[in-house]
Amino acid sequence: MNSGGFIQENFSIFQASHEGSWAILAILFLVAYFLFRGGKSKAGTIIHMIARLFFVIMLVTGASMLIAYQFAYFFFIKGILAVLLIGFMEAALGKAKRNENSLGMLFAVLVVLVVIVLMGYGIIRF
C-alpha cells in the first residue's frame, strides 16, 4: 500500500487528531508549568509526561499532514516552528521545575504558539 495514499485517504483523521493535540497540549503545558511554579513537583511531573505523549502525537500527525501537503514550504516552516515550540516548552518546564527564572522561555512559548496558531487559521500566510 502506498503510504501517501493512506495519508491522503485519512487526512481528516490526521487533521482532527492534530488540532485536538494542540489544544490539549497547550492546556497540559500551562497546568504543568503552574504546578511546578507552585511547588507541586510530583503532580507537575505526571502532567509533563502526559504532555510529552501529546508531543509525539502532534509530531506524528503533523508529519503525516506535511507528507499530504507534499512538503509545501509554508507547512514545512510551520513544522519547524512547532519543533522549536516543543523545545521551548521543554525548556520552560525544566526551568520551572528547577525553580529558575522561566519567564523568558514562557514568553517564547507564547509568541511561537500564537504565530503557529495564526498560521494554522490562515491569518499569517506567505
UniProtKB/Swiss-Prot annotation:
Transmembrane segments: 16-36, 43-63, 66-86, 104-124
Membrane topology listed for this record: Multi-pass membrane protein
Key words, A-Z: Cell membrane, Membrane, Transmembrane, Transmembrane helix
Pfam family, one: DUF1516
Subcellular compartments: Cell membrane
Cellular-component GO terms for this entry: plasma membrane
Family: Belongs to the UPF0344 family.
Protein name: UPF0344 protein ABC2900
